[in-house]
């Protein structure tokens, strides 16, 4: 039989859910890694030529295989690192008189830093960030780079801490018990414009709320089917597509996904339907907190402290 020779290339994708088609049609860059051999470079150039039919050549980057593989992991690790970094600062902002949004804007105007992924929140999710960071940490451990592994592990640890901290804020704000109280959760997808719930912060938040014997009512425009699967083993959880129905007789409302529809809800109507005092916990900092406080809400946000009528 005639022998078959082939080359293995690395061509990591950098697509984001919700913008995958546009990311493919007009990517920031395409990265192709090939072996540094004659046949490896021929194979690499073949794939370059395919991409060059619709992508400008200057956006097509080439490297060796290891560089391409690590670039994928490092890209997601750096993005997640920014989220965990600003979330770490959000805790300090709450302890002082700082506003994390103002801090993020101030540092984001520095051209060396930029403004993307500097929005404090309940945490990052999705199928890639945690997986890729843990992969990076594992590689570091494999090569005996323990300090580097611990550094990247801390990005994940900080994210999980932020989710737990959000639940503790709810508990402490509501007089240290939520047993028997109805808590409406708006948003379950890990981010807006997708029904994907993989590694969504809402999973751990809702499970912790339920473990405190709260009655949790979850609403989301696209993710309810996945939410039911993710929380199949949890008790005390209900699902309601209509956000206005979800908040009826609720003692608290928590925003966990930055859906645009939540920015335009009638919050006077929501306040009127809730038990009093009506608590609102904005885990994505997407609402007008001053306006909500004027309506009558007890407002708690990430990195901004609280606006309350109870003091």
Where are these regions (language model features)?
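Structural/interface elements that position substrates and couple domains in central-metabolism enzymes
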Residues: 1-311
């Amino acid at each position: 039989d005639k022998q078959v020779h082939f080359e293995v290339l690395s061509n990591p994708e950098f697509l984001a859910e919700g913008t995958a088609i546009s990311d493919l049609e007009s990517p920031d860059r395409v990265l192709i890694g090939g072996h540094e051999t004659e046949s490896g470079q021929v194979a690499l150039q073949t794939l370059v030529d395919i991409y060059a039919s619709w992508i400008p050549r200057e956006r097509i980057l080439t490297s060796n295989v290891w560089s391409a593989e690590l670039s994928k992991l490092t890209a997601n690790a750096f993005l997640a690192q920014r989220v965990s970094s600003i979330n770490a600062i959000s805790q300090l902002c709450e302890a002082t008189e700082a506003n994390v949004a103002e801090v993020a804007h101030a540092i984001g105007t520095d051209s060396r830093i930029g403004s993307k992924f500097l929005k404090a929140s309940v945490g990052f999710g999705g199928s890639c960030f945690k997986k890729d960071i843990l992969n990076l940490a594992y590689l570091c451990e494999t090569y005996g780079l323990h300090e580097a592994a611990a550094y990247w592990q801390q990005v994940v640890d900080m994210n999980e801490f932020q989710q737990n901290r959000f639940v503790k804020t709810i508990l402490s704000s509501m007089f240290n018990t939520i047993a028997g109280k109805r808590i409406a959760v708006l948003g379950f997808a890990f981010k807006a414009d997708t029904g994907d719930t993989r590694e969504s912060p809402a999973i751990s938040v809702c499970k912790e709320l339920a473990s405190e014997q709260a009655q949790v009512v979850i609403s989301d425009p696209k993710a309810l089917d996945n939410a039911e699967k993710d929380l199949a083993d949890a008790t005390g959880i209900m699902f309601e597509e209509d956000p206005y129905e979800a908040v009826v007789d609720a003692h608290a409302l928590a925003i966990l996904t930055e859906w645009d529809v939540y920015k335009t809800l009638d919050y006077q109507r929501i306040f009127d339907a809730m038990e009093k005092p009506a608590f609102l916990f904005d885990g994505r900092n997407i609402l007008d907190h001053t306006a909500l406080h004027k309506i009558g809400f007890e407002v708690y946000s990430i990195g901004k402290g609280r606006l309350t009528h109870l003091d």
